[in-house]
Amino acid sequence: LGLRSKRVGYCINVGIQLIKTGYNLRDYCQIAISRLAKISNSLAQRRKMQLVATSCRLGEGSELGPEAVIDNNRTSPKYIDIGANSYCRGRLLLYAHGGQIKIGDYCYIGIRTEIWSMQSIQIGDRVLIAHDVNIHDGTAHSPDAKQRHEHFKNILKRGHPSTWDDVPGVVAEPIVIEDDVWISFGATILRGVRIGQGSIISAGSVVTSDVPPGMVYQNKIEPHLRPIK
C-alpha cells in the first residue's frame, strides 16, 4: 500500500478504538477530515516540488500556484527560468523542437494564461500578466493545408516533432516584454513583438507589432478577409 493508504487505514483504526471507548464520533470525524486534508495538501506540494525540479528553474521566494502547469517538452529545466519572488498560476509550455521562457523577479502570471514558446519569450521584472492572456512566439501550424494535415498525422503517429525539419511552414520570432509592463485580461501577444518598459496592454487587445515604452495599447482586431497566399 502507498503512504496515503496506510495513513487512511491508521485513521480508521484509531477512530474505531476511540468510538469503542465512548469518544464522540462527530468530533473524531472533524479531526480526521482535517488531518487527511493536511496529508493531501502535503502530498500535492511534494508532487509540485518534484515537477519544479524536473521541468523548470524556480528562483528564491517564487511559487507555482495549484493551477499552474509546466509543460516542458525539451530535455532540461534550464529552458524555463523563473526569477525570484514571482508567482505563476498559468501554463508555461515549450515545444520539443525549440523554445525557452525566461521570467524575471516579482512577476505575476494569472490563472488560465498560456505562454507557449518555440523560439524565445523573455519577460522582465515586476511584470503583471492577468488571467486568460495568450502569449505565443510561433504560428504552431503551416498556412499550407497539406503541410498542416501531415503535421497532424505525424503527431498522432510519433508524438510532437523534435526538430524544425519536422514542422515545415511554421514560423517563430522572439517576444520581449520589458520591465514593469501590465498585460490586462484576455490580451493576446503574438510573435516578434517587443513591449516597452512600463507599458499597459488593455483587456482583450491583440498585439501584433512593437509597443513603445510608457504607452497604453488598445487594439481590437476588426474582421478582415484576404486570400491565403
Task: Tell me what each language-model feature is.
Residues 133, 193, 205:
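Short beta-to-alpha loop/turn elements within the nucleotide-binding domains of ABC transporters
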Residues 194, 209-210:
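Conserved functional loop/turn residues at catalytic and ligand-binding sites
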Residues 1-143, 150-155, 160-163, 167-180, ...:
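Domain-scale signature associated with acetyltransferase and cell-envelope carbohydrate enzymes
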Residues 218-219:
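Catalytic binding pocket for nucleotide-activated donors in carbohydrate/polymer assembly enzymes
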Residues 184, 190, 202, 207-208:
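Short hydrophobic beta-strand segments in globular cytosolic domains
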